[in-house]
């Protein structure tokens, strides 16, 4: 992607969705952290289905910890890898209570010290809960960074660091959401919907996927 096209690329995404939001349902930083922990290799739809039952019963670190691993598993067993996720969330809840007064920390180092929390999860929490201009690179953003030529890289960290350099400051806060939503619904893994893509003219991907033929 040509450097001069990057501002136009993001301006177009902004015009289509001025205030993008995560599709995970949450009301507090801890609910967001819990939902993101549960979302690894799972869909937001599946996570929301589970947390709609879990959060009315337990939506604080102490309440989650009080459920215990087996109690928590009953609420999240419809989600993939639920056993390991339950252990991580219980241990994370314990650490939040004992080390952070039951609050979600606001620094990357403290977040990444929590069980199951890596760079991507920390970036989501910092961006969505605390309004920091971080970019969490998931499978959709990794694919888009390489396919479009916006931020090609061999690893998610490569893509993240290039995005930090290339995304204009005025678009940095919402860049994560614009890219993930575009990758989820338009720039999909197989047969990207180029015919519906508002930013196709700026993208390096060739040949563009034609619109499906109608009968």
Regions found by a protein language model. Name each.
Residues 2-214:
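Catalytic cores of DNA base-excision repair glycosylases
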């Amino acid at each position: 992607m040509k450097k001069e096209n990057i501002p136009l690329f993001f301006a177009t995404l902004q015009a289509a969705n001025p205030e993008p939001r995560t599709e995970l349902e949450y009301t507090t930083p801890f609910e967001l952290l819990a939902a993101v922990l549960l979302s690894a290799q799972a869909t937001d739809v599946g996570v929301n289905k589970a947390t709609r039952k879990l959060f009315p019963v337990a939506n604080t670190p102490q309440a989650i910890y009080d459920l215990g691993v087996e109690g928590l598993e009953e609420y999240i067993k419809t989600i993939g890898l639920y056993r390991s996720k339950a252990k991580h969330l219980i241990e994370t809840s314990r650490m939040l209570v004992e080390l952070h007064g039951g609050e979600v920390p606001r620094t990357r180092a403290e977040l990444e010290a929590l069980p199951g929390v890596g760079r991507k999860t920390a970036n989501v929490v910092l961006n969505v809960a605390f309004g920091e201009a971080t970019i969490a690179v998931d499978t959709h953003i990794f694919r888009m960074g390489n396919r479009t030529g916006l931020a090609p890289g061999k690893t998610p960290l490569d893509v993240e660091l290039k995005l930090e350099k290339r995304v204009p400051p005025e678009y940095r806060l919402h860049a994560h959401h614009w890219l993930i939503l575009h990758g989820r619904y338009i720039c999909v893994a197989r047969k990207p919907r180029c015919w519906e893509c508002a930013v196709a003219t700026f993208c390096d991907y060739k040949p563009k996927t034609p619109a499906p033929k109608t009968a």
